[in-house]
Amino acid sequence: MATAASNPYLPGNSLLAAGSIVHSDAAGAGGGGGGGGGGGGGAGGGGGGMQPGSAAVTSGAYRGDPSSVKMVQSDFMQGAMAASNGGHMLSHAHQWVTALPHAAAAAAAAAAAAVEASSPWSGSAVGMAGSPQQPPRPPPPPPQGPDVKGGVGREDLHAGTALHHRGPPHLGPPPPPPHQGHPGGWGAAAAAAAAAAAAAAAAHLPSMAGGQQPPPQSLLYSQPGGFTVNGMLSAPPGPGGGGGGAGGGAQSLVHPGLVRGDTPELAEHHHHHHHHAHPHPPHPHHAQGPPHHGGGGAGPGLNSHDPHSDEDTPTSDDLEQFAKQFKQRRIKLGFTQADVGLALGTLYGNVFSQTTICRFEALQLSFKNMCKLKPLLNKWLEEADSSTGSPTSIDKIAAQGRKRKKRTSIEVSVKGALESHFLKCPKPSAQEITNLADSLQLEKEVVRVWFCNRRQKEKRMTPPGIQQQTPDDVYSQVGTVSADTPPPHHGLQTSVQ
């Protein structure tokens, strides 16, 4: 056995079958190399006391399938270096190992064969955790009843798993495992449990440790890239179930029950799904939170659809049509945009500026603000229509505001007379404006405003940088034109061109 321990590349070595990287001593190796029938002795030896640096229990599943035992040299060399330094790949969180044999020694010996044949984790989970730094302890007294799952071993198992998990940390509660085929034939373990209650109690801890996790993921820590069982063995195909269970187990590298404390309800959930022998697609409610019995996995998807109460929300076409009608009606009634804003503030308590009303008519407000302003303006229109012909509150409000004056329209003949007078005198005096207004039968203010607007128009038509010349200046310069001075009208033509 010393030769086998010194040469770890032998395919029949029990160390590879157990997934351990620590050389075992004579006692541990002798207990683990007994084959399928002798696996019970190995399990009993592991339960009786942990030898320093020993792989206490070996798994017949890996030993019986040489094709699945593949070495990853880099990972094995790391494990060998750790073993030569007196340590273990599992570092400092190996204290839980001695608490694993929480079941009775006799019960473990009675159920070891069934457990080893049914679950590849039954031996390898203990063998991988063997530490040369852990002193041997005497086996604890046998517990009463099937309380193994709630003992110290479970708590230590949680601590060891959380410390050795090398994958990305789980943020929040991890998702429960999906339904899938269970390798190793859990039916055999269930039959053994039905035959002997002690065997069921002893086999319950490995089953809970394995849970729904298939063999590709180690219980202690996981390797990315498909490395399994301390990163040394490839994924063995599930006996009877093909590779279906191994393929579906890549969703969660650590059993969720080992990260958070399991409840008896969750334990019942695991036992309930042990009866399935074929892979199932993951249920939708499993991805939303901890599993609950009685169909309690209904997530927010069922309640996320809230009926939208947008019956009164107008569309963009409705807003555009209303804005157009509102502008036409407002102009017809003779109200300014400022009058509308003032009326809205007085009647409904919401004061709007003239700019806001202008932007509403031009469809330059946001859709939300347009929807808010539309009902107020609609009420104002109804009030204005009902008050036509009778002095009501809206008329009084409009009277307080700035009432729009009717646009002055000047006939073509009158406009021609004003143009001819503008060419003669673009800036007439007050007396000239009064005489012109009387002759044209216009108001004095209308004539004055027309001349002001005409001068502004002339200023806009003249390009900047060119000295503006009035018609009077042109006429006055005609008699003083010299040979070297071009005519003023010629200069104006060139400037326009």
From Swiss-Prot:
Residues 31-51, 240-250 have a biased composition (Gly residues). One of its GO terms (molecular function) is protein homodimerization activity. Residues 31-62, 121-189, 230-316, 458-497 are annotated as: Disordered. Residues 465-483 have a biased composition (Polar residues). Residues 269-286 have a biased composition (Basic residues). Residues 403-462 bind DNA. One of its GO terms (biological process) is negative regulation of apoptotic process. Residues 133-145, 170-180 have a biased composition (Pro residues). Residues 311-385 form the POU-specific domain. It is found in: Nucleus. Brain. The keyword DNA-binding applies. InterPro entries: HD, Homeobox_CS, Homeodomain-like_sf, Lambda_DNA-bd_dom_sf, POU, POU_dom, POU_domain_TF, TF_POU_3. GO terms for cellular component: nucleus. Pfam families: Homeodomain, Pou. The keyword RNA-binding does not apply. Keywords: Developmental protein, DNA-binding, Homeobox, Neurogenesis, Nucleus, Transcription, Transcription regulation. It comes from the Eukaryota. Belongs to the POU transcription factor family. Class-3 subfamily. Homodimer. PANTHER family: POU DOMAIN, POU DOMAIN, CLASS 3, TRANSCRIPTION FACTOR 3. Transcription factor that acts synergistically with SOX11 and SOX4. Plays a role in neuronal development. Is implicated in an enhancer activity at the embryonic met-mesencephalic junction; the enhancer element contains the octamer motif (5'-ATTTGCAT-3'). This is POU domain, class 3, transcription factor 3. It comes from Rattus norvegicus (Rat). The lineage of its organism: Eukaryota, Metazoa, Chordata, Craniata, Vertebrata.
